[in-house]
């Protein structure tokens, strides 16, 4: 019989509790929260499953499980999220990085293989900085600018740049509503963005952990099509000839965005599907 304070027993009890609260992936969340608390890899929980937690550890774990039972995302409880081979600090001022955005980073790096030299790159609506910082890690010779309308989001991005890249000076940070505060003389070879694109009318269909905790400024729009059209038009003016815009978008808007953009002077455009088969990405060339 397992001791009531052992790792294995506490995991089982936590899983049962979270399931009763209708939390998806209850077991996984229970493991992540405990492994992070004990500073262990998840697999090490089972190597040490007979280990007993002390009173302080038990209380801290109980508090974490209670937070998760109220739909608080695991990433906000642990203050971190893995993204493209790095661990990013996150809080409720930034969107939690998604696997689809990792795919966006991968597409950029795949398209820009080889020694193409120095590139000026803008990560627009940067949030945690996960896109721009991941690109900088892979391509040291790229000049990266991170911009966001939210001062609090830029503070998170700055913290991540320091922790992951070693020195803040590797990247430029700009607080800006789209391109409004970005110097007009600044021209970019590449703009990458995961902007807000979910219609506010779809809000009720979202999971409670998203609605209750993630920043609505980074998610929802009254009119995504108009917002994205404005973004695309402004991006055109800031790209060099032959420059590219990579966007994560609402799949239902992909065809419209491509046709409208070509009609307004973009050289070409293409749609890329994510791993689930949705038309998630638009790539435009000036």
Curated annotation (Swiss-Prot):
Pfam families: MTS (PF05175), PrmC_N (PF17827). It is an enzyme of class 2 (transferase). The keyword Signal does not apply. Substrate binds at residues 194-197. It catalyses: L-glutaminyl-[peptide chain release factor] + S-adenosyl-L-methionine = N(5)-methyl-L-glutaminyl-[peptide chain release factor] + S-adenosyl-L-homocysteine + H(+). Keywords: Methyltransferase, S-adenosyl-L-methionine, Transferase. CDD domains: AdoMet_MTases. Its EC number is 2.1.1.297. Belongs to the protein N5-glutamine methyltransferase family. PrmC subfamily. NCBIfam families: hemK_fam, RF_mod_PrmC. This is Release factor glutamine methyltransferase.
